[in-house]
């Protein structure tokens, strides 16, 4: 499902930003 893949990528990028700040 393309929607789930986009959602997963969005959360992964968001998590990467959070981890990048610390």
From Swiss-Prot:
InterPro entries xref list: PSM_alpha (IPR031429), PSM_alpha_peptides (IPR053383)
Coiled coil: none
GO biological process: killing of cells of another organism
Domain of life: Bacteria
UniProt key word Cytoplasm: no
This protein's UniProt keywords: Cytolysis, Virulence
UniProt entry tagged with the keyword Protein biosynthesis: no
Role: Peptide which can recruit, activate and subsequently lyse human neutrophils, thus eliminating the main cellular defense against infection.
Stated family: Belongs to the phenol-soluble modulin alpha peptides family.
Name of the protein in its database record: Phenol-soluble modulin alpha 3 peptide
UniProt source species: Staphylococcus aureus (strain MRSA252)
